[in-house]
Design a protein with these regions (language model features):
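Mid-domain alpha/beta scaffold segments of enzyme catalytic cores
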Residues: 3-251
C-alpha cells in the first residue's frame, strides 16, 4: 500500500478514498483511513452482498458512518448484472434479487441522511430501478454516481437532480462516446474523477491492474472533453472532492 500511495503522491494525488464490499472489508477500509492521514473511507455493504445486511451489520455500519474518517456511505446501490451469479468472492454466495438490494439501498440512504455523509452509488444495468428509488427516498446532501457508466439520457436526468457524476477509466475507452459527452455537459460542481481500482484501468494501460496513480489519465481525458488544461481540471475535481467529502485536501 505504501508504494502505491507514494506513486499516487508523486503524480499529484492529494488523497484516497477506499472502500470495502462486505462488512469486514469495510471495517478494514476504515482502519486504513485511521492509520493513513491521506486516506479516507466510504462505508457500506456492496449491493452484491446485500443479503448480509442484517440487524447486527446495520448497527456496525451505523457506528462506522459517524466516524470522522468515514466520508461517504458507499458503495451501495443496485446491480442487476450479477443477480444469480457467483461474483467470485470467497463466501461463494450469489448476488441477491433487486428487491433485497433495494431494501439494503434504502437503509444506506437513510444512513447517509442521518450521518450527513455523501451517498456513493454503485449501479450496473439497473438505471430505471435506481432512479426510481433515489426519487422517492429521502435526499442525502450529496449523491455520487460512482464509476458512472450509464447512457446519456440517464446522465442528463441525474444531473438535473443534482447528482455528481464520477468518471473512471472507462471514459477513455474508444467506444464510450456517450460517457465523454456526459463529461462535457456536466456542470463543474457535479463532476469527479476516480480510479475504481483495481478495475477500469484507463488507456493506455487498459488491462493492467489499476491504482490511484493512473487517475491522471482519466482526468486528462475529461479535461480534453471540457476544453480545460489537465491542471485546471485537477483543481476543479479536487475542490469538488474536498467539498463533497468535507475534507481538507490542501487547496
Amino acid at each position: 500500500m505504501y508504494k502505491r500511495q507514494d506513486r499516487a503522491n508523486a503524480v499529484g494525488v492529494r488523497g484516497v478514498c477506499t472502500v470495502g464490499d462486505g462488512i469486514e472489508e469495510t471495517e478494514k477500509a476504515l482502519q486504513a483511513a485511521e492509520f493513513h492521514d491521506r486516506v479516507w473511507a466510504a462505508c457500506a455493504v456492496h449491493p452484491t452482498k446485500a443479503q448480509t445486511v442484517t440487524g447486527e451489520v446495520r448497527e456496525r455500519l451505523r457506528e462506522m458512518a459517524f466516524h470522522p474518517r468515514c466520508v461517504a456511505i458507499g458503495e451501495t446501490g443496485l446491480d442487476a448484472y450479477w443477480i444469480g451469479k457467483d461474483t467470485g468472492a470467497d463466501d461463494g454466495e450469489e448476488t441477491p434479487s433487486i428487491e433485497v438490494q433495494e431494501e439494503a439501498l434504502r437503509f444506506h440512504i437513510d444512513l447517509a441522511c442521518e450521518s450527513g455523509k455523501a451517498l456513493m452509488i454503485h449501479n450496473r444495468e439497473a438505471d430505471a430501478d435506481l432512479l426510481r428509488v433515489l426519487a422517492d427516498a429521502p435526499q442525502p446532501e450529496s449523491v455520487i454516481l460512482h464509476c458512472f457508466s450509464s447512457p446519456l439520457d440517464v446522465a442528463k436526468e441525474s444531473l438535473d437532480r443534482g447528482y455528481v457524476l464520477s468518471f473512471a477509466g472507462n471514459v477513455t475507452f474508444k467506444r464510450n462516446e456517450e460517457l465523454r459527452e456526459a463529461a462535457r455537459i456536466a456542470p463543474p460542481e457535479q463532476i469527479l474523477v476516480e480510479t475504481d481500482a483495481p478495475y477500469m484501468t484507463p488507456e493506455p494501460f487498459r488491462g493492467a491492474r489499476n491504482e490511484p496513480a493512473f487517475v491522471g489519465y482519466t482526468a486528462a481525458c475529461v479535461a480534453e472533453q471540457r476544453g480545460l488544461a489537465p491542471e485546471a481540471l485537477g483543481e476543479l475535481v479536487t475542490g469538488n472532492a474536498a467539498r463533497i467529502y468535507g475534507i481538507d485536501l490542501g487547496m
